[in-house]
Amino acid sequence: VAEIRPNGPDVKTIVLKSEDGAPLAPFRAGQYVSVTAHIGETVTTRAYSLSGSPAWAKRGEYNIAVRRDPNGFVSPWVQDTWQVGQKLTISGPQGQLYYERLRDAKKVVALAGGVGITPFMAMARALRDGLEDFDLTIIYGSRTEAGIVYKKELEEVAAACDKVHVVHVLSDEEKEGY
């Protein structure tokens, strides 16, 4: 664990880096890693979507976001006990929620809610970095403006890349612009 930073009221972004700075396994935007958790005498795994650009794996970095579920077993443990410098066991990238040129349309509409934005954040970053070539419109639901995960980053990527468009929808408050 290289860095932990807040990302909304109940979400933390966790920056994972290789111990020696070596590149990490490459991934496609939309994939996830499984993290092994040793909690007391229990060993379990949880899948977390990678939210960083696939280009970051070359510099030995993955990003995940973890939302605290007050009734959860792993997420409170992650948020309360993980510290910078902690070593983790994670799988290589997995999953098929990525853009496939031969399979998918050139214009993609993604629906996301809350921390479910993470795979689409990776896609937006990949588009910005020139690693993918499709048009992405994200319809992103949040309860409140304060609860929008990656709000600033989404705005920056959309401003920098004309292939990324974000439409925010709020369920628990009415605000101009949403």
Features from the language model and the residues they span:
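Ferredoxin-reductase
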Residues: 1-87, 106, 142-144, 155-158, ...
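FNR/FR-type flavoprotein reductase catalytic core
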Residues: 71-178
